Amino acid sequence: MEINKAGLDKLRAHPYLNFFQAKIIIEHRRTKGAIKSLSQLALYEEFAEKDLNRLSAYISFD
């Protein structure tokens, strides 16, 4: 999934993202621009290391 292009509904539909994580992604893009790496998501308490490890195989930052 292209994390910088997916809308809220598509993000929420991903089995490894919950509603709060999806909202953080949308808000980050709105206020700070594109997400360039998982390390940016790691700055948010809603993203535990296990969450990021699971997501890494399924998302891209294009």
Residue locations for each model-derived region?
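Compositionally biased linear targeting/interaction segments
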Residues: 1-62
